[in-house]
Amino acid sequence: SVWVFYRNMRPLYVLLHWLDSYQTGKKNEALNNDTQITEFRKLNDAAVRYAERTEQMFEQQKQFIGNASHEIQTPLAICRNRLEMLMDDDSLSENQLGELMKTHQTLEYITKLNKSLLLLTKIDNGQFTDTKDLELNTLLKQCLEDYKEVYDYRNIEVNITEQDRFHIVMNESLAVALLTNLLKNAFVHNMDGGRIQIIITKNSITFRNSGSGHPLDEEHIFERFYQGSKKEGSTGLGLAIADSICRLQHLNIRYYFEQEEHCFEILK
């Protein structure tokens, strides 16, 4: 009968459900799937072994990226300092100085990229455990002060509408990284004489900015290294960092295009 068939196949359905809900690098429930059928027991054992190998590979990959990024920091800093010393040499010709400046810009880009990769690794590893109650309204205004000069340089107008206070318990460094990456994004993908509107409610923060008259690819914009249109100095990791922080904090982040403006919304 159908009931007998379902009863016999139940261990398979339990295993499939466990595999479907399994997330590498996360805290997963142990497979609890007792069965007298030898083939299903072997299948259970094989699935658990495969999951364990996947976890080991995932941990090794995270450690490699983290260690590599950390070790690269010192030689990058040394190279940058030596280049700056060379650029102070009065005997350099204009062409030589120009080439050194180009090299310095490339080195600055690599340094930014390395720092972003290191931050992503720390987020993935769950290393930001020190949390406290934060009010992001005040923190956002503090972050904006750091960008006032560059916004003024491009005549970008910034307005904040505070409908309520946005409170959250999280690591302060991560909160700053989340807000600054969205502020950077609104600047980099804006235009001279453009505008940025930030709307804060009790459960959401929305960044709206003028820019190109075309919507971004919402399926890929949060992927690491994705750049719909290459912007000078952009690593392609800013939105990926924002997305990783939101997922860690159980926040939702979404993009939409409305009234010729690019909108990024953080939702509790």
Task: Name each model-derived stretch.
Residues 260-265:
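Glycine-rich GHKL/ HATPase_c ATP-binding element in histidine kinases
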Residues 208-215:
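Glycine-rich acidic phosphate-binding loop
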Residues 2, 50, 124, 185, ...:
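Alpha-helix C-capping/helix-to-loop hinge sites
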Residues 1-68, 72, 77-88, 92-94, ...:
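Membrane-proximal HAMP signal-relay module
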